[in-house]
């Protein structure tokens, strides 16, 4: 299987399967001299860790990360720091139940990657989906923790803004609330509505979709590139690569189609510091594929989890029509744990964009009035 690596200068290769002994990633391109410990990565893995709530998978994984390479500590380094060599991170799987999948070893689960993998490779890991499992995203979150250290002036944070048909009230948006409920919701009032919906879904043995919104602040104007390496194209590709992601929009996204030119254009005035100030952010912080200095805003739509308890019609490898009921432990709403994954992928894209921009121009950005 190819294409397990993403990024250009900041490159991440993930490895491992849902029911294998371990999974992890190799991060290449991290500059030397950056303080890095397992504890700094673990903070973010704990946000994604399964078994933390009633409406996520009950698979109990500690997701304890080990740094196998790429760091060094001696009397001169003032703590453990990156060396500039590949950073290898490993997370052991400790709570697999492969027997839950023995009855579907030859069946293609509707809505899952089973059939597509089999059609391409002629072989597949049916135990939890192998590489197609959301378990793979633990490695992405670990890589994202490293990426954040390369861009310390940038803040990346995400929130759940919709579960099923129920959207937040944006007038209630409060980032502090995302740490006060298990759904990372910025709107406290929507939480009981979501819980009622999720309880109905859980009792029915079904699943539901969700939308995650991510915001990156502190990104200066100038990161990215025109045409074929647009920052929004790189970000959209990274977010679409997340398991169960089915749609991405930047800024106003599809809603911009209903606007007029005068409504959609982000007008500018001069600020007291001599730099332009935008009066709106319909573009989501990216213009012409290059960051504008505005907050970068994107949303990701996650489909309902394909593995559900309700019997469905499908076929098996022998070409027989069968009825399938999936066993195992699965997320009624995979979008809940998608929040830290969306943050991680955004951080990786921005770290890569920063390194590429610095390599091309030698500086972070060109303030208005500055000479090249």
Curated annotation (Swiss-Prot):
Pathway: Metabolic intermediate biosynthesis; chorismate biosynthesis; chorismate from D-erythrose 4-phosphate and phosphoenolpyruvate: step 7/7. The keyword DNA damage does not apply. Its cofactor is FMNH2. It catalyses: 5-O-(1-carboxyvinyl)-3-phosphoshikimate = chorismate + phosphate. Transmembrane segments: none annotated. The keyword Lyase applies. GO terms for molecular function: chorismate synthase activity; FMN binding. PANTHER family: CHORISMATE SYNTHASE. Belongs to the chorismate synthase family. This is Chorismate synthase. It comes from Caulobacter vibrioides (strain NA1000 / CB15N).
């Amino acid at each position: 299987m190819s294409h397990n690596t993403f990024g250009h200068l900041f490159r991440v290769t993930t490895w491992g399967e849902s029911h294998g002994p371990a999974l992890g990633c190799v991060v290449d391109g991290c500059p030397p001299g950056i303080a890095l410990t397992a504890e700094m990565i673990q903070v973010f893995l704990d946000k994604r860790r399964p078994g933390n709530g009633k409406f996520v998978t009950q698979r109990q994984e500690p997701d304890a990360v080990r740094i196998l390479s790429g760091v060094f500590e001696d009397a001169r380094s003032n703590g453990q720091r990156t060396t500039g060599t590949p950073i290898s991170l490993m997370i052991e799987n400790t709570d697999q139940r492969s027997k839950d999948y023995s009855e579907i070893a030859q069946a293609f689960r509707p809505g899952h990657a089973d059939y597509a993998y089999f059609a391409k490779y002629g072989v597949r890991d049916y135990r939890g989906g192998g590489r197609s499992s959301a378990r793979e995203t633990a490695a992405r979150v670990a890589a994202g923790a490293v990426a954040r250290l390369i861009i310390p002036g940038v803040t990346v944070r995400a929130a759940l803004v919709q579960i099923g048909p129920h959207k937040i009230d944006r007038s209630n948006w409060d980032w502090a609330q995302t740490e006060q409920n298990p759904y990372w919701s910025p709107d406290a009032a929507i939480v009981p509505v979501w819980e009622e919906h999720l309880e109905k879904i859980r009792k029915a043995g079904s699943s539901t979709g969700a939308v995650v919104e991510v915001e990156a602040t502190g990104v200066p104007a100038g990161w990215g590139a025109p045409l074929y390496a647009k920052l929004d194209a790189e970000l959209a590709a990274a977010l679409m690569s997340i398991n169960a992601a089915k749609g991405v929009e930047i800024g106003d996204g599809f809603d911009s189609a209903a606007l007029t030119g005068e409504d959609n254009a982000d007008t500018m005035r001069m600020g007291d510091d001599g730099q332009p100030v935008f009066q709106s952010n319909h573009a989501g912080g990216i213009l012409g594929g290059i960051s504008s200095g505005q907050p970068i805003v994107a949303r990701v739509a996650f489909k309902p989890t394909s593995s559900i308890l309700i019997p469905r019609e499908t076929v098996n490898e022998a070409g027989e029509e069968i009825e399938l009921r999936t066993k195992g432990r699965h997320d009624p709403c995979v979008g809940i744990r998608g929040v830290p994954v969306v943050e991680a992928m955004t951080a990786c894209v921005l770290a890569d964009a920063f390194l590429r921009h610095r390599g091309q121009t030698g500086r972070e950005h060109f303030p208005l009035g500055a000479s090249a």
